[in-house]
Every structure is written in C-alpha cells, then in structure tokens.
Amino acid sequence: MSDVTLSRASSEHVPLLLELVAEFCEVDQHPYDPARVTLALGPLLDDDQHGVVYLVNQDSGYLVVTWGYSLESGGREALIDEIYLRRRGEGLGGKVMGALFVDMAARGVVKMFLETETHNRRARAFYARQGFDEDDSIWMSREISATE
C-alpha cells in the first residue's frame, strides 16, 4: 500500500464526512444525528482554533482531533475524538497514526489522548502498538444544558 495522505477537510467535504460519520456510528453502534454532527463540524472546518478534521486518502476514512491545554502535560494536548477507516486490518491505521504524530509534533502538541470502550480489546491493542498507555485515571462526563 502507498503512503497515507491526511488532508484537512473543509466545508465542501461535509456530505462525504456525514457519510463517513454515519458509517462509523453504524459500525460502533453509536446514535447518529446528522444535524448535530453538521453543527459540531462547522467550527472545526472553519479554522484550526478548536481542532482539525482530516480525510484519509481523500475518502478512505476520517479523523477528528481537538485541542486542550494542561499544566500536568506541560502544554498543548490533542484528543483523538474520532477515527474511522473504511478498511481495517491492512496496515492503514498504523500509517495514519504515524502521519498524525508528525503533524501533531509540528503543531506543538506535547501529549495525545484518546478514549475507547473497555470491551474493545482490538482497538486497545492497536493503540498500545502505537505507543499509547492505559492510564489509571477515569474519564467522567456531564452534559451541559444551554439554560445553566
């Protein structure tokens, strides 16, 4: 397989991204709301302030990375919010991660995070091969309503 290309998605790619996100949600059995996804994509496609959306080899998949900042990490952090590849088990994922690490270093990222389900051993093994460690910390979340 040839080298991987990560290209920054733009607003013209929304139809393709919605198709890819729908596929991802179907595979991972997540709810899919195209209106919510379109709204969330907007700021990421407008500029890099909040993060970046990449297309993998134009239409082989997508990757969403968002920014954070931490004293503990010593600077800029990146969270792999979503990654979806149409074809798996062919080595593309490792190439995508390698290209992503190069781009993240160029953007000043000092630490990367991701979250995957506990039961997804295949994903956990893949991420471990890419150098990610399982932390002892626990992710917690809370929805924030517009009326708070």
What are these regions (language model features)?
Residues 9, 83-85, 116:
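Hydrophobic adenine-recognition pocket in adenosine-nucleotide-binding enzymes
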Residues 105-116:
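Conserved GNAT acetyl-CoA-binding A-motif
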Residues 128-137:
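Conserved acetyl-CoA-binding loop of GNAT-fold acetyltransferases
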